[in-house]
């Protein structure tokens, strides 16, 4: 017996795929409804506006990001190792065709208005990533944990942008080694 996907999930999964591959502004509700096979009335019953759908997607992606972060870093025995493990995994991901950049950067670029709901979710996510990097940098014994966290943050976002711009031929093959250089410079004696 085949299990049926709920209409709300069909809409969400379709929107998530389209937003990530093509952008938020480029994809309209008509396209999402047509691609999901769900009527617009049903779509609007679950997501009263496109912004609601964008926010739901970003919140779900935030949860995925942190679950992945924990999975990637849990076996690293030290804070330094956790940072390195994250950047090694990120390097592997941004070199794949599945990577279309960072959905949080993408939404902030397409909706630069600070009061846009998607922009707000993106800002919250990025602030929490910076805070986690800062915590790990401090625990790793960085001389200036704020500077190291910000450098790593910029490196991460640069890798996402390079993936979006260059696809699989991006300069990310040096991402993990660049992170290691920054970490070593702040934590070596």
Where are these regions (language model features)?
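Short hydrophobic/aromatic patch on the recognition helix
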Residues: 37-47
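Alpha-helical DNA-contacting segments of helix-turn-helix folds
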Residues: 54-61
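Short, solvent-exposed amphipathic helices
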Residues: 71, 117-128, 132-135
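Amphipathic alpha-helical segments used for helix-helix packing
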Residues: 96-117
